[in-house]
Amino acid sequence: MGPTLAGQNARVARTPCQFRPGFSPKVPRVSRRDQIKLSEEELLALLEEERVAIVSSQGPRGRPHSMPMWFVPRQGEIWIWTYARSQKVKNLERDPRATVLVETGREYQELRGASIEAEAEIHRDPATVLAFAEELTLRYAEGISALEGDAKAALEAQAPKRVAIRFKPVRTASWDHRKLGGTY
């Protein structure tokens, strides 16, 4: 004879979930992950608000190479600029897979962020690099709305040594612990 339930000799047809304490087929369970996930609008707002992203690529010895970078969000994508001969560029030339982390909050109940798995696309065209450099500078410079004179000349001098990198999201995990309402 087969296995018995609760010492009975006959099999009782039950689904495994009926044995969980508190199970109710009429009340759908919401996972914590779904509860704290950012909506598309919340994610875009976070990317607009925050100023530093941690960009991680695979280093030459196979370990993560993570660097803080200023960035510009463009329609859900992350763009940065860096020196063309930097380690992160060498890493992304070898393997374009990257993870970009944008987060904020000091206390657990304040934590909010997104971990974006992405494919990196390196742009070397001087016009593209310069246009992006201007956009990045305007995002971070306070009190200016246009680049002129010495500021523009400085960017033009740096652009030939730089690249712009576009991170196209493949998968995003996000969280906003404020949505937990103090319960953990």
Predicted feature locations:
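AMP-binding (ANL) adenylation modules
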Residues: 107
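Charged, gly/pro-rich active-site loop segments
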Residues: 23, 27-38, 111-184
